[in-house]
Amino acid sequence: MTKELCMRCYISGRVQGVWFRASAKKLAEQLMISGWARNLADGRVEVFACGKEDKLEEFYTWLQKGPLNARVDVCTRENLPWEDYISFDVL
């Protein structure tokens, strides 16, 4: 059985105003990942995501590229213990 865990990522570059959070939500829902994404005042996007380890790996790979109009310069990741979220929200 695949392990369930959470991760917190900080994404910097041209990641605000390019549908990054909405695109992340769409993919997260397809991968059955819960959590949230929000813009930060310093121009980064913060993502907290929980799901099966293999699905989180796929999601993280996408976060490193982002949607078509984004430019990701840095994407950091911290693995965290499982938390039970119901949906993936854009904050």
Swiss-Prot record:
Its EC number is 3.6.1.7. Keywords: Hydrolase. It catalyses: an acyl phosphate + H2O = a carboxylate + phosphate + H(+). PROSITE patterns: ACYLPHOSPHATASE_1, ACYLPHOSPHATASE_2, ACYLPHOSPHATASE_3. The active site is at R21, N39. GO terms for molecular function: acylphosphatase activity. SUPFAM superfamilies: Acylphosphatase/BLUF domain-like (SSF54975). Signal peptide: none annotated. InterPro entries: Acylphosphatase, Acylphosphatase-like_dom, Acylphosphatase-like_dom_sf, Acylphosphatase_CS. Coiled coil: none annotated. The keyword Transport does not apply. Residues 6-91 form the Acylphosphatase-like domain. Belongs to the acylphosphatase family. This is Acylphosphatase. It comes from Legionella pneumophila (strain Corby). The lineage of its organism: Bacteria, Pseudomonadati, Pseudomonadota, Gammaproteobacteria, Legionellales.
